[in-house]
């Protein structure tokens, strides 16, 4: 069978089969459909942040830690779950600053981080400042404080793009971590 491509207009089930109607007029009938639409990263709403996402604005010490080792890293914590990677980033650089933007300063983890030499600053972030070569240069706070940075860490929320599959009952449910949504599956990956 030759490959067929096109945007899905209608997706329904009948007699144990899936019927997929494509925008170009093709109709495909199949026993299984692989729902692979990906996720959308929802970033904190901070001026200048999105333009650096995936380059100088990162989220994971395992994915990006090697590239930011020994650099000035500012971690913007907008939710308590964002405290989790801080100790891991601290192992990669002794120039880590945590900015608590909307997170209570009394978290027990903060004492551990301060004891490990992490600077902790409280206050809302105003914007991310770009340097002359286009990379991140600083994090500006609402109170006028400017913190020099070579890289910024944030916690992104995951949004499942499940709308095309809603007619089949595939709807996103919240992750237990609070980091976004997912489509529940059984241990074999079936929905």
PLM segments and residue spans:
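General small-molecule cofactor/ligand-binding pocket signal
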Residues: 2-4, 58, 119-121
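A conserved short coil-to-beta-strand element within the FAD-binding core of flavoproteins
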Residues: 4-17, 122-134
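Glycine-centered tight beta-turn/hairpin loop motif at sheet-sheet or coil-to-beta transitions
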Residues: 23-25, 142-144
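Short hydrophobic core segments
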Residues: 27-40, 149-157
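FAD-site-proximal beta/loop scaffold in flavoenzymes
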Residues: 51-67, 158-191
């Amino acid at each position: 069978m030759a490959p067929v491509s096109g945007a899905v207009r209608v997706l329904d089930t009948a007699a144990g089969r899936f019927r997929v109607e494509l925008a170009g007029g093709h109709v495909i009938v199949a026993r299984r459909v692989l729902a692979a639409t990906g996720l959308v990263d929802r970033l904190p709403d901070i001026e200048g942040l999105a333009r650096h996402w995936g380059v100088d604005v990162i989220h994971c010490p395992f994915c990006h830690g090697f590239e930011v080792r020994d650099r000035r890293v500012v971690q913007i914590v907008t939710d308590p779950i964002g405290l989790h990677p801080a100790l891991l980033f601290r192992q990669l650089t002794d120039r880590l600053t945590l900015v608590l933007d909307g997170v209570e300063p009394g978290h027990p983890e903060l004492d551990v981080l301060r004891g490990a030499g992490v600077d902790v600053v409280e206050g809302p972030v105003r914007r991310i400042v770009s340097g002359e070569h286009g990379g991140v240069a600083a994090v500006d706070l609402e109170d006028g404080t400017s913190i020099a940075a070579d890289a910024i860490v944030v916690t992104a929320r995951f949004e499942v793009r499940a709308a095309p599959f809603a007619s089949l009952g595939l709807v996103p449910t919240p992750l237990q971590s609070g980091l976004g949504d997912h489509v529940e599956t059984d241990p074999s990956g079936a929905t």
